[in-house]
């Protein structure tokens, strides 16, 4: 894949499986919109499996959760299926739960806390997000190469797929 044009090694479209999203609220919708916008604007996404026709991007991505697994459905620019990458979600359960808890604290702090308290909670939130992004990069190793910012945005979207009312 190293011979491929780097400008093609990217996601051009992201879709979340609507059946996987069980609950919505305005904060979650805003997080989803921002993550998708930022992801489309700037990302590095390189599936590691070679394809017989040499296809090397750009990619359309659909994320869904099924039977405790995260599924990355990867398609060509024209929408034709390319491959699916499946990850078990067991190792992500705690980071997702912790991230939700710190986000709740952050949203509460915004309403009632001092700037210094908000900054402290925000730093903790960012640290958890960074750790989860690194974990995602490790889990994708050998399957899909992504940069750190892409992994952070993908983790945000994975969280959106796990929100319960």
Swiss-Prot record:
Pfam families in the record: UPF0262 (PF06793)
Protein origin, superkingdom: Bacteria
InterPro entries: UCP032146 (IPR008321)
Family of this protein: Belongs to the UPF0262 family.
The protein, known as: UPF0262 protein Sala_0765
């Amino acid at each position: 894949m190293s011979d491929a044009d780097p400008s093609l090694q990217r996601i051009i479209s992201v879709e979340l499986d609507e059946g996987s999203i069980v609950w919505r609220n305005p904060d979650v919708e805003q997080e989803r919109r921002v993550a998708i916008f930022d992801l489309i604007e700037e990302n590095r996404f390189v599936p590691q499996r070679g394809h017989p026709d040499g296809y090397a991007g750009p990619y359309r991505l659909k994320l869904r959760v099924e039977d405790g697994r995260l599924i990355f459905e990867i398609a060509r620019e024209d929408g034709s299926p390319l491959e699916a990458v499946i990850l078990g979600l067991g190792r992500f359960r705690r980071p997702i739960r912790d991230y939700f808890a710190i986000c709740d604290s952050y949203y509460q702090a915004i309403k009632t806390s001092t700037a210094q308290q908000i900054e402290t909670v925000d730093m903790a939130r960012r640290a958890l997000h960074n750790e989860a992004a690194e974990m995602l990069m490790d889990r994708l190793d050998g399957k899909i190469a992504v940069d750190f910012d892409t992994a952070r945005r993908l983790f945000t979207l994975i969280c959106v797929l796990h929100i319960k009312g």
